[in-house]
């Protein structure tokens, strides 16, 4: 009977070790995907702010030239 208990414990232990390793790899992959998503979001925000700054500068120049032309 003791032999069966030891065998069962060994089987359970050997099943839990790979399961633990798989969970760790899964967490690492999820972290990498999250990091990639964050990087893409930062790139999009940087591009959008660059476009808005350029548009604001052009609009400011246009308004400035219109007001100088009226004087």
Curated annotation (Swiss-Prot):
What protein name is recorded for this chain? Plasticin-C2
Q: Which family does it belong to?
A: Belongs to the frog skin active peptide (FSAP) family. Plasticin subfamily.
The keyword Membrane is assigned to this record: yes
One of its GO biological process terms is: defense response
Could you tell me which residues carry Asparagine amide? 68
> What Pfam families does the annotation carry?
FSAP_sig_propep
Region annotation Disordered: where it falls in the sequence:
25-46
Q: Which organism is it from?
A: Agalychnis callidryas
Keyword annotations for this protein, in alphabetical order, are:
Amidation, Amphibian defense peptide, Cleavage on pair of basic residues, Cytolysis, Hemolysis, Membrane, Secreted, Signal, Target cell membrane, Target membrane
